[in-house]
Amino acid sequence: MSPEAVSPLRRRMIEDMTIRQFGEKTRRDYIRQVREFTAFLGRSPDRAEPEDLRRYQLHLASLGASYARMNLASTALRFFFHVTLGRPGFGDRMARIAEPERLPVVLSPEEVALLLAHAPGLKYRAALLLAHAPGLKYRAALSLAYGCGLRVSEVANLKVADIDSSRMLIRIEQGKGRRDRFAMLSPDLLDLLRQWWLVKRPRGWLFPGQQPAQPITTRQLNRACHAAADAAKLDKRVSMHTLRHSFATHLLERKTDIRVIQVLLGHRKLDTTAVYTRVALKAIREVTSPLALLAPPPPS
């Protein structure tokens, strides 16, 4: 496909997404999906036929693509054909793959404490005396994910000005779904953040990246989380999002109203929050099995 054929289409698709105020990540993902479909097709995507979309899905399935990957391709290509090319119904032959319902991985409070204690670099206990305290930085970041139930992108994009110590709140700007919200700020977490600020004295981003003008990346945070889990010898698959899952589950096990948890997590629908009722196991463990209540039969 010639650059002359691609460039106008890509530009128009970007404009269509800009008009609809799609997030930067969504725009990148959609462009990449159309680019990969074009490479498979071997010609300009505006010359595609409905059967080509079906063949492409079959191609992805043969490669072992995940449910999320298959559905992202379907959503992006539907947008491209329906909106950018003005062909409503063109992508109807693309199947929507039903994702299996998997329970989130949740750490126990003891495992969370162990994870935080093994944040990379935390062996430097006199962190406040050091010019660089990587352990304090990552412990603060991981503590935010667990203590406030934040997504990894929300931790990465926090600014110093978002910490409202007078009201004990953290402002989350433009979280998922481009909605602002407030997260709770505990005294212990505030103390930890103040320790971090005294060491680094960040002015803009709370956790600056390698380039101070840019925030830390989500990849860096997840790597730090994986390193802490390995050092703590946890046998579960742990990521930054695991800390968010654990936050919600532990609140639910302490009988916090699920609607309050919904607000803290920034969920639009209560159904999304309700998944944690399936992993909040304290109530299940406290139930007495009917087997234990059976009386022995009278002697014959």
Indicate where each model-derived feature is located.
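Conserved catalytic core of the tyrosine transesterase superfamily
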Residues: 1-300
